[in-house]
């Protein structure tokens, strides 16, 4: 899976590990500042049948096992914390405009493996409380821009510590609906469409993923439990969700760094 001709521009695995830690430390501070988030501790295991695990696309099975100390009750390794976070917000009585984030560890044994997907998931998971009036495409885009700003600030700070890693992100992120993307590249499959638009714009947010498009197919599968691809938005399309993708010059393809929505 290592691209032909790849070399470590940091010179050693030790420097790579230092850079990874720097990115994680910087980004969590930048993200929490942009979105007014408090870091919380999250579980890796939840009890089966409680409705707390993420069903992803509705067909993936979690790693499950009986718990001896709980009379053999079934427990599951989390897929993600999408549902758990909402329970936590309610338990903590988090006010409007504030939220939580966590460094999530999960297992997805049915994941299709490649350079960007593993059965082990280590990601930032976040959620915040908003008002009913903020359920809009405008607010979604505003939030995406804040996240993108946190990424850019992290990129620039990383460059100060590791000048071999030069900033490459554009000033602004490009927004497009999945239907618009289909009309733009009707002869390409969804992944090819992503690669084409992200290669051109470098940073893209695709709106409305999960909705059935004019070709009779969704751009990609999403969880019906929490992904809203059906609400009519201000642009005349449907969806208050989407994916944030960046261009990866090493792999020469787009890669999703955030799947999110209202």
Regions found by a protein language model. Name each.
Residues 31-39, 145-156, 214:
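Hydrophobic/aromatic-lined pockets within catalytic cores
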Residues 55, 90-92, 115-118, 139-141, ...:
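Surface-exposed beta-strand edges and their flanking turn/coil or helix-capping segments
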Residues 98-100, 121-125, 201-203, 241-243:
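Extracellular structured ligand-interaction cores
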Residues 102-195:
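Extended, charged alpha-beta segments that form solvent-exposed binding/catalytic grooves
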Residues 107, 177-262:
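A translation/RNA-centric and nucleic-acid-associated enzymatic feature enriched
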């Amino acid at each position: 899976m290592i691209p032909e001709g790849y070399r470590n521009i940091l010179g050693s695995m030790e420097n790579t590990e230092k850079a990874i830690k720097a990115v994680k430390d910087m980004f969590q501070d930048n993200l929490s500042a942009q979105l007014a988030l408090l870091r919380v501790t999250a579980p890796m295991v939840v009890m089966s049948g409680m409705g707390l695990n993420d069903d992803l696309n509705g067909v993936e099975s979690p790693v499950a096992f009986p718990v001896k100390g709980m009379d053999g009750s079934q427990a599951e390794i989390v897929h993600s914390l999408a549902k758990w976070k909402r329970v936590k917000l309610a338990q903590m009585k988090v006010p409007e405009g504030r939220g939580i984030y966590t460094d999530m560890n999960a297992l997805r044994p049915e994941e299709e493996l490649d350079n960007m997907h593993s059965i082990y998931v280590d990601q930032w998971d976040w959620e915040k409380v908003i008002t009913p009036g903020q359920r809009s495409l405008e607010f979604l885009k505003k939030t995406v821009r804040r996240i993108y700003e946190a990424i850019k600030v992290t990129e620039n700070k990383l460059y100060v510590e590791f000048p071999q890693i030069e900033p490459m992100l554009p000033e602004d992120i490009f927004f497009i609906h999945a239907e618009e993307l289909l009309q733009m590249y009707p002869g390409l499959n969804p992944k090819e469409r992503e690669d084409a638009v992200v290669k051109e714009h470098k940073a893209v947010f695709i709106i409305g993923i999960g909705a059935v498009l004019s070709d009779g197919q969704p751009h990609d599968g999403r969880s019906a439990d929490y992904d809203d691809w059906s609400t009519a938005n201000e642009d005349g399309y449907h969806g208050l969700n989407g994916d944030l993708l960046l261009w990866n010059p090493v792999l020469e393809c787009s890669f999703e760094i955030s799947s999110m929505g209202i």
